[in-house]
Amino acid sequence: MKLNRVESTRSRHRRVRRKVGGTGDRPRLAVFRSHQHIYAQVIDDQQQHTLVAASSLEPEFKTQYGEGDTCAASTQIGKLIAERSLAKGIQKVVFDRGGKLYHGRVKALAEAAREAGLEF
C-alpha cells in the first residue's frame, strides 16, 4: 500500500523519536513546521518539561519580521531559540526535525541556531 505524504511524515517522525530523546544534560530541540509558521522547543524528555520555546506566532516576532512562512523567518527563529537557550545555560542539544526533511525552513532554523552558539 502506498503511503501519502502525511502518513510518510508521521512514520518518519515516529522512527526519529524512537532514536532521539532529550535529557537534562542534553535536551531535545524539537522543530515543527506548518504551512504558515514554524515552532521550536527545547525539551527535557526525562522531566517532560519544555525549557525554552520560540515560534513565528509570537507578537514581538510578528511585528519585527512579519509572516513566518519563509526561510528568513526560520533563520530568525533559530537565532531566537539559541539566544534563549544560551541565556538559560543550555549549550548542547539533540536536533529533532519532527519527521520533516532536513531542507528549506528546517535547515535554515538549524543552521541559524548553530551559528548563534548551540551545539548539535
UniProtKB/Swiss-Prot annotation:
Any one biological process term the GO annotation gives: translation
Keyword Ribonucleoprotein belongs to the record: yes
InterPro entries (UniProt xref): Ribosomal_uL18_bac-type, Ribosomal_uL18_bac/euk
CDD domains tied to this protein: Ribosomal_L18_L5e
Region (Disordered): 1-26
Entry GO MF terms: 5S rRNA binding; structural constituent of ribosome
Basic residues: compositionally biased ranges: 11-20
Pfam families in the cross-refs: Ribosomal_L18p
Basic and acidic residues composition-biased segments: 1-10
Keywords of the record: Ribonucleoprotein, Ribosomal protein, RNA-binding, rRNA-binding
Cellular-component GO terms for this entry: cytosolic large ribosomal subunit
Domain of life: Bacteria
Family from the record: Belongs to the universal ribosomal protein uL18 family.
Complex formation: Part of the 50S ribosomal subunit; part of the 5S rRNA/L5/L18/L25 subcomplex. Contacts the 5S and 23S rRNAs.
Function as written in the Swiss-Prot or TrEMBL entry: This is one of the proteins that bind and probably mediate the attachment of the 5S RNA into the large ribosomal subunit, where it forms part of the central protuberance.
Stored PANTHER family: 39S RIBOSOMAL PROTEIN L18, MITOCHONDRIAL (PTHR12899), LARGE RIBOSOMAL SUBUNIT PROTEIN UL18M (PTHR12899:SF3)
Protein name: Large ribosomal subunit protein uL18
Species for this entry: Cyanothece sp. (strain PCC 7425 / ATCC 29141)
